[in-house]
């Protein structure tokens, strides 16, 4: 991972346009090719970013100090450096991945056992389908025989959608599986995550933990 702290301005050109005026910012360039720009007041959420696969070109000559990031759709993130305060690279190695909490692990097990929760005619291929970047929670087929990758969270936020997006990009390269569509499943899905998922063609499924466990809601009982 490369970390750059710089005074810079940022312009995005794609389905819409956006501009970040000059200010000190943190730029992360990850091994997967993603580039994200961060301020000091938004927790983990970037001000702007470009998801992989994308290419970073650092300008030379008259273009020195201008970084251009282009993704496969032709969208551009142009970062104009005014002053670089820090620039370092670090080899983090292969991450062991997130260890799911008890509820998420149980949700995965329950949903695999009741895969028709996602729709009539769904069949399970396998849980923890391994890929080069980590395991997909559930891989299944819909009633039409299409492949579906399911990412399960207790609380569905943007980072979960990004994770599923990376899995889908990889799975769709496999001719034996493609086309693969995604379903983001959680007990609660944040509005921003739902908007991002919908924009990327990913379905959303709210999971009722008690219903999956076969526990009736007392409020629905008449006696």
From Swiss-Prot:
Taxonomic superkingdom: Bacteria
Main localization of the protein described in the UniProt heading: cytoplasm
UniProt enzyme class: hydrolase
Compartment(s) of residence: Cytoplasm
Enzyme Commission no: 3.1.-.-
Keywords: Cytoplasm, DNA-binding, Endonuclease, Hydrolase, Nuclease
Gene3D superfamilies per record: 2.70.180.20, 3.40.1350.10
One Gene Ontology cellular component: cytoplasm
Keyword Mitochondrion found: no
Alphabetized InterPro entries for the sequence: Endonuclease_NucS (IPR002793), NucS_C (IPR048301), NucS_N (IPR048302), NucS_N_sf (IPR049173), tRNA_endonuc-like_dom_sf (IPR011856)
Nuclease keyword on record: yes
GO MF term list: DNA binding; single-stranded DNA endodeoxyribonuclease activity
Family: Belongs to the NucS endonuclease family.
Function text: Cleaves both 3' and 5' ssDNA extremities of branched DNA structures.
PANTHER family referenced in this protein's UniProt entry, alphabetically: ENDONUCLEASE NUCS (PTHR38814:SF1)
NCBIfam families xrefs: PRK03298.1 (NF002876)
Name recorded for this polypeptide: Endonuclease NucS
Organism: Streptomyces coelicolor (strain ATCC BAA-471 / A3(2) / M145)
Gene: nucS
């Amino acid at each position: 991972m490369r970390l750059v702290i710089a005074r810079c301005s940022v312009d995005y050109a794609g389905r819409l346009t956006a501009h970040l005026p000059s200010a000190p910012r943190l730029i992360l360039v990850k091994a997967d090719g993603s580039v994200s720009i961060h301020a000091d007041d938004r927790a983990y959420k970037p001000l702007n970013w470009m998801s992989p696969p994308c290419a970073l070109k650092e300008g030379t000559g008259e273009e020195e100090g201008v970084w251009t990031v282009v993704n496969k759709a032709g969208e551009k993130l142009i970062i104009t450096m005014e002053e670089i305060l820090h620039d370092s690279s670090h080899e983090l190695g292969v991450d062991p991945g997130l260890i799911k909490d008890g509820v998420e692990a149980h949700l995965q097990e329950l949903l695999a056992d009741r895969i028709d929760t996602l729709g009539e005619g769904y069949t399970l291929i396998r849980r923890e389908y391994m890929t080069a970047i980590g395991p997909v929670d559930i891989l299944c087929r819909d009633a039409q025989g299409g492949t579906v990758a399911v990412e399960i969270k207790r609380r569905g936020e943007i980072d979960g959608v990004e994770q599923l997006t990376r899995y889908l990009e990889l799975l769709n390269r496999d001719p034996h599986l493609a086309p693969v569509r995604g379903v983001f499943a959680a007990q609660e899905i944040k509005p921003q995550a739902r908007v991002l998922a919908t924009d990327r063609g990913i379905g959303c499924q709210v999971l009722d933990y008690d219903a999956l466990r076969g526990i009736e809601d007392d409020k629905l009982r008449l006696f």
